């Protein structure tokens, strides 16, 4: 029964912890939160466009903005991802932008490794400390990877490469590709994050000529069984908030469909900057950057990226204009 004096007094005297939840985010209710639906739609669109950022953006959003308990936020995000990622993967499979052989080799390593990671987390004496340290290392790796992607973009533009969205034939390297799956699976099993962003960085380093559309499609597809394996652990041992999960599904599934349709048909030159931006944001969150600071940093990154784009584009455009004035028509030899 509701007693106004006791409730009001408790609310005044109790110390603030997280933001006051919007609605009932307990594990048993099915309340749909429209704000979570909207937020998950934004994240779902980014996941569909890039294949990355799901765990790094969705979970902090639930905890910091909506006051969901961390354990419930992680578990609910994983379960919702089981429906979200197959939608994006299906779009890319239909478009033919998935390297099925790469997916097979990666899954061969990632799914067993995900269970191994969950077991290691269970037996470690300082599990929370180990998880935090892993996330910090993962964040640093993602930031280095984002910087490498920017450098590669600059070099490609200077050299006149990477101006088409053609899908190149990628010959799988079985052992290194399985190793990528193992590394990603263990980290996902221990931290519940990194199934998309980490795999993208590792794939880029192993297969530097892979196209952006094929990169996103392959990453989304390999993440499906990996996310399912992690979600099984969440269902068995986690604390799922069913209302939060339903809200995430309602927002993210349609949005990831739209994002995947765009990423499977848009030119590479538009997709790669978005991938880099999302991976950089994920890396900053993993290393512990606060939400407000992250916002200002990302604004600065966008400004720097725009200035860099202007600096790189102008010489290339000028050279292209000069070439247009050159007569390349073959002439008969003069005897």
Report residues per predicted region.
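Hydrophobic transmembrane alpha-helices of secondary-active solute transporters
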Residues: 43, 47, 184-189, 204, ...
């Amino acid at each position: 029964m509701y007693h106004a004096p006791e409730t009001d007094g408790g609310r005044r005297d109790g110390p603030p912890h997280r933001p006051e939840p919007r609605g009932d985010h307990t594990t048993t209710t099915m309340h749909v939160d429209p704000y979570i639906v909207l937020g998950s739609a934004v994240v779902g669109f980014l996941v569909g466009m890039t294949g990355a950022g799901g765990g790094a953006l969705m979970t902090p959003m639930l905890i910091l903005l909506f006051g969901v308990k961390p354990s419930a936020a992680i578990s609910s995000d994983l379960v919702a991802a089981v429906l979200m990622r197959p939608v994006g993967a299906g779009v890319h499979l239909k478009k033919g932008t998935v390297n099925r052989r790469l997916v097979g080799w990666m899954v061969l390593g990632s799914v067993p490794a995900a269970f191994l990671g969950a077991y290691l987390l269970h037996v470690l004496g300082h599990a929370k400390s180990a998880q935090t340290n892993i996330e910090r290392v993962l964040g640093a790796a993602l930031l280095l990877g984002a910087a490498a992607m920017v450098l590669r973009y600059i070099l490609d533009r200077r050299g006149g490469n990477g101006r088409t969205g053609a899908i190149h034939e990628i010959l799988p390297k079985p052992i290194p590709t399985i190793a990528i799956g193992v590394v990603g699976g263990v980290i996902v099993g221990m931290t519940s994050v990194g199934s998309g962003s980490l795999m993208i960085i590792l794939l880029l380093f192993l297969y530097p000529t892979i196209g952006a559309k094929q990169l996103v499609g392959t990453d989304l597809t390999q993440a499906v069984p990996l996310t399912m394996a992690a979600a099984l652990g969440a269902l068995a041992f986690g604390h799922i908030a069913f209302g939060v999960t339903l809200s995430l599904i309602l927002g993210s599934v349609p949005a990831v469909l739209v994002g995947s349709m765009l990423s499977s048909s848009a030119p590479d030159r538009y997709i790669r900057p978005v991938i880099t931006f999302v991976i950089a944001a994920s890396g900053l969150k993993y290393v512990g950057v606060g939400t407000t600071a992250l916002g200002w940093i990302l604004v600065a990154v966008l400004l720097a990226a725009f200035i860099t784009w202007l600096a790189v584009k102008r010489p290339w455009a000028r050279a292209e204009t000069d070439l247009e004035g050159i007569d390349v028509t073959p002439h008969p030899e003069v005897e």
